């Protein structure tokens, strides 16, 4: 049966594979000319990510160009928010803006339970089309934002440098924040199940801003809600591999391993050999390559991939960057990353 599964799914399940699978976070996006051309025709990010034809087309752009082992849904971690009654806009170069930041008990109590098949049917449509058309030549990936990161956006109202508003809530009104986090955990768990039902074969949870927490606050406000999302998903889809990514996670790797996820995606600020010692063997590892290396020459890109792989050869591993690919990355360097990655062998 292992032969019938796409490579990334096989590797994520812990089956024996000939080489590590390779894909990139943000592999569909601004570094690709074909994407920038489409963006000129459709300047609204929400339209690009919520119109199923456009989202499908963008999701497939890197697959046509590079044949990665994973095809990830083109969407955004904030996409489920309107289904809960929180509206947002994404302004080019500024990032997301929440129209009415959530800061009171009344607002939290008025949030709707997320019904993904109703408010996010376009996501289901895209995933089922991807699954059908990619036809197991690659693994279909879904993703969500974790409760802490979603809460950080909706409380702050936008991206933040120091997260003073949500931290003020955490330390002054912890019960209010826990209520919000719990609401998000249930909704995000349901959303992930909907993605899996629609065609996602592996899913990734992005807790992008959990790296801003001290370990003790991670244990209070991030870890338990990541775990709750995982438990909701595993209750219905115990076999679907779940990846967890946190930017700036070097201080909480052991804690991430206790959430029930199958794979931990590393940023590039931690030594991968050290990470292997800190993460239990049963848990796979993804990423760790500095996206900045893709601004280097081909030789340096290949050497960095080889160095990373040689340090982790005896572990379940998915080759990826330690963060999303950066805008302005030369496309031919992305090509080198994929081509060289596919030459690795166990």
UniProtKB/Swiss-Prot annotation:
Localization annotation: Cytoplasm
Coiled-coil ranges per UniProt: none
Swiss-Prot/TrEMBL keywords: Cytoplasm, Decarboxylase, Lyase, Porphyrin biosynthesis
Domain of life the protein comes from: Bacteria
Main location per the UniProt record: cytoplasm
SUPFAM superfamilies according to UniProt: UROD/MetE-like
GO CC entries: cytoplasm
Site note Transition state stabilizer, residues: 76
PROSITE patterns: UROD_1, UROD_2
A GO BP annotation: protoporphyrinogen IX biosynthetic process
Associated pathway: Porphyrin-containing compound metabolism; protoporphyrin-IX biosynthesis; coproporphyrinogen-III from 5-aminolevulinate: step 4/4
A single GO molecular function term of this UniProt record: uroporphyrinogen decarboxylase activity
Broad enzyme group: lyase
Its EC number(s): 4.1.1.37
Entry binding sites for substrate: 26-30, 76, 153, 208, 323
Record field: catalytic activity: uroporphyrinogen III + 4 H(+) = coproporphyrinogen III + 4 CO2
NCBIfam families named among the record's database cross-references: hemE
Oligomeric and partner information: Homodimer.
Protein name, as recorded: Uroporphyrinogen decarboxylase
Organism annotation: Prochlorococcus marinus (strain AS9601)
């Amino acid at each position: 049966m292992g032969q019938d599964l796409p490579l990334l799914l096989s590797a994520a399940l812990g089956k024996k594979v000939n080489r590590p699978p390779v894909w990139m976070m943000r592999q569909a996006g601004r570094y690709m000319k074909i994407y920038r051309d489409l963006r000129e025709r459709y300047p609204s990010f929400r339209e690009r990510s919520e119109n199923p034809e456009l989202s499908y087309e963008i999701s497939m752009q890197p697959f046509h160009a590079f044949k990665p082992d994973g095809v990830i849904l083109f969407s955004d971690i904030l996409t489920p928010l309107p289904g809960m009654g929180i509206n947002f806009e994404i302004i080019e170069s500024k990032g997301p803006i929440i129209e009415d930041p959530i800061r009171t008990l009344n607002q939290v109590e008025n949030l709707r339970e997320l019904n993904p098949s109703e408010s996010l049917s376009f996501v289901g449509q895209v995933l089922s089309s991807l699954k059908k058309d990619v036809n197991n030549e690659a693994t279909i990936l879904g993703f969500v934002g974790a409760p802490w990161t979603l809460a950080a956006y909706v409380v702050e109202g936008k991206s933040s440098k120091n997260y003073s508003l949500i931290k003020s809530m955490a330390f002054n009104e912890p019960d209010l924040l826990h209520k919000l986090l719990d609401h998000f955990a249930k909704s995000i768990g349901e959303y992930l199940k909907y993605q899996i039902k629609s065609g996602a074969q592996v899913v990734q949870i992005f807790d992008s801003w959990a790296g801003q927490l001290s370990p003790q606050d991670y244990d209070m406000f991030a870890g338990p809600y990541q775990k709750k999302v995982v438990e909701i998903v595993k209750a219905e889809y115990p076999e679907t591999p779940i990846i967890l990514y946190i930017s700036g996670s070097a201080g909480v790797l052991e804690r991430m391993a206790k959430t029930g996820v199958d794979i931990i995606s590393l940023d590039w600020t931690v030594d991968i050999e050290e990470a292997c010692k800190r993460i239990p063997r049963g848990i796979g590892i993804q990423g760790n390559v500095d996206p900045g290396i893709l601004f280097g020459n081909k030789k340096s890109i290949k050497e960095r991939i080889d160095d990373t792989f040689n340090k982790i050869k005896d572990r379940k591993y998915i080759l990826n960057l330690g963060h999303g690919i950066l805008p302005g990355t030369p496309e031919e360097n992305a090509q080198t990353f994929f081509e060289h990655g596919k030459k690795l062998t166990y």
